[in-house]
A protein has these predicted regions:
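Phosphate-binding glycine-rich loops of NTP-binding sites
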Residues: 1, 5, 30, 166-172, ...
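Conserved ABC ATPase signature
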Residues: 115, 119-174, 181, 187-194, ...
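Phosphate-binding P-loop
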Residues: 175-177, 208
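Residue-level preference for the first positions of well-ordered beta-strands
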Residues: 179-181, 213
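C-terminal lobe/lid and adjacent interdomain/linker elements of RecA-like ASCE P-loop ATPase modules
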Residues: 198-275
C-alpha cells in the first residue's frame, strides 16, 4: 500500500481480478484512472462495467459494516476504556462500552454537533452544566465521560443508567455521519416518559432525512402510543417460530384504532392476529 498526495492506493483481488482503488478524503472509492480496465498482471483486460459492478458490491459491503446495533450495557459504558480507533469514523459498540471515544470522535468531526448533544442533555437533565470526555495517560491512554452538575464533576461510573442511555442514543441519532441502519433493543429501558418522547422525536427527525432507517424493539405501551399503527410490526411465536405481522393490515382493527391508540390496543391484546 502506498500514499500519494494524501490519496491511498490499495490493491484488491475480487474473483481473481486485480485492480487499484483510490480512496479520496471523503471516504469515496474510485478506480485509479491509469489502471482502469486493465489487470495489473496483464493476463487479460476487464471492462469498466465489471469494475463498476465490483465497486457496487464493495459499497454494499461497507454499507452493511456501518450498520449500528444497540443493546446498551450502562455498567460497561461507565468504565474507562482504552482508545482503539483505527479509522476516521467509528461505530458505537453494541453495548455502548466505547461511548467516551465515540463522543470524542464526534467532537473532532463536528464540534457543533457535540455541543448540540450537550445542550439537549441539559434540557433533559436540568441539573447538567457541562459534559467532557477526559483522557488519562496512566496505564495507557484511557478515556471516560465526566458530567458537571453544579460545582461537582461526576465520572461516568457514578452516573445513572438512564443518563448513560440517553447520552448514547443522542450521540448515535445526532452523529454527523449517521449509520444507514440503526437497530435499538428495548429503547425505553431506563428512560422516563418525557425522555422517551424526546428520543422518538429525534428518531423522526433522522428518518425524515431519508439517509437512515431506524428499527426499535419495545414492550412499552406508552412508546407505542407515540407511533402510528402503520409503523408497528408485531412479533409473536407460533410453535416456537417467530411470526411477523402488521397490525395496520388487519381489517378488524380499523374501527378499534379510531378509538384507541396502539399502546392501548397492545394492552388489550388487540394487535395480535390471535386477539
Amino acid at each position: 500500500m502506498s500514499y500519494l498526495s494524501k490519496k491511498k492506493f490499495s490493491r484488491y483481488h475480487l474473483n481473481n481480478l486485480k485492480f487499484i482503488f483510490k480512496r479520496e478524503d471523503t471516504g469515496k472509492f474510485f478506480i485509479q484512472d491509469k489502471f482502469q480496465g486493465q489487470c495489473l498482471d496483464s493476463e487479460s483486460l476487464i471492462s469498466t462495467f465489471i469494475v463498476r459492478e465490483k465497486i457496487k458490491q464493495y459499497d454494499i459491503y461497507t454499507n452493511i459494516l456501518n450498520w449500528q446495533f444497540m443493546s446498551l450495557n450502562p455498567y460497561l459504558m461507565g468504565s474507562p476504556k482504552p482508545i482503539k480507533r483505527t479509522s476516521k469514523y467509528i461505530n458505537l459498540a453494541s453495548d455502548g462500552s466505547n461511548i467516551a471515544e465515540y463522543l470524542l470522535n464526534i467532537y473532532k468531526l463536528d464540534q457543533n454537533v457535540f455541543e448540540g448533544i450537550v445542550e439537549t442533555l441539559k434540557y433533559i437533565l436540568p441539573y447538567t452544566r457541562d459534559l467532557q470526555v477526559e483522557e488519562t495517560l496512566e496505564l495507557g491512554r484511557n478515556v471516560y465521560i465526566e458530567l458537571t452538575e453544579s460545582n461537582f464533576k461526576l465520572p461516568a461510573w457514578l452516573l445513572s443508567t438512564g443518563t448513560l442511555r440517553i447520552l448514547a442514543l443522542l450521540a448515535v441519532l445526532r452523529h454527523p455521519k449517521p449509520a444507514p441502519l440503526i437497530v435499538i433493543e428495548e429503547i425505553e429501558n431506563g428512560l422516563d416518559p418525557r425522555s422517551v418522547d424526546l428520543i422518538v422525536d429525534e428518531i423522526r427527525k433522522l428518518v425524515e432525512t431519508e439517509t437512515t432507517q431506524v428499527i426499535i424493539t419495545t414492550h412499552s405501551p406508552y412508546l407505542l402510543d407515540l407511533l402510528h399503527l402503520s409503523q408497528i410490526i408485531l412479533v409473536e411465536r407460533d410453535e416456537g417460530q417467530p411470526i411477523f405481522s402488521r397490525p395496520a393490515d388487519q381489517e378488524s382493527l380499523q374501527e378499534w384504532s379510531k378509538k384507541f391508540g396502539p399502546g392501548k390496543l397492545y394492552t388489550m391484546s388487540r394487535l395480535s392476529q390471535k386477539g
